[in-house]
Design a protein with these regions (language model features):
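Rhodanese-like catalytic fold shared by cysteine-dependent sulfurtransferases
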Residues: 1-25, 33-69, 78-117
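Short, surface-exposed ligand- or partner-binding patches at beta-edge/loop junctions that are enriched
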Residues: 73
Length: 117
């Protein structure tokens, strides 16, 4: 059996999803506080910095209980992929997406007002 992996989503496709009639996904940003100070995603997100997983780990099942698809975001798409893999190991029924290229791709392809760092 193949291991579960998050589905890749490009920045422009995520933008379309957030603007169309489909229910919005739950956005989870795994970047650190200092990174959020540099560049914020222009939508509501859950902030789960990986370095402080002890602060949010226990609440994950509650926060994901509504069954919405989850899109995980980081700077370049690597840390978010790792969290996405972990989420699918814990809750294989979830629909998990990874923003390819992270917020950097969002800045390059969707919204240049989001600073690059």
């Amino acid at each position: 059996m193949e291991p579960l992996t998050p589905r890749p989503i490009q920045a422009r496709d995520l933008q379309s999803w957030l603007q169309d009639d489909r229910p919005d996904p739950l956005l989870v940003d795994v970047r650190e506080d200092a990174e959020l100070d540099l560049a914020r995603f222009p939508a509501d997100v859950l902030h789960w910095p990986l370095s402080r997983s002890d602060a949010w780990l226990e609440s994950v099942p509650q926060q994901l209980a509504d069954g919405r698809p989850v899109v995980v975001i980081c700077h370049a798409g690597v840390r978010s992929l790792h969290l996405g893999l972990w989420l699918l190991q814990q809750m294989p029924e979830l629909e998990v997406w990874n923003l390819e290229g992270g917020i950097d791709a969002w800045s390059l392809h969707v919204d240049s007002s989001v600073p690059r760092y």
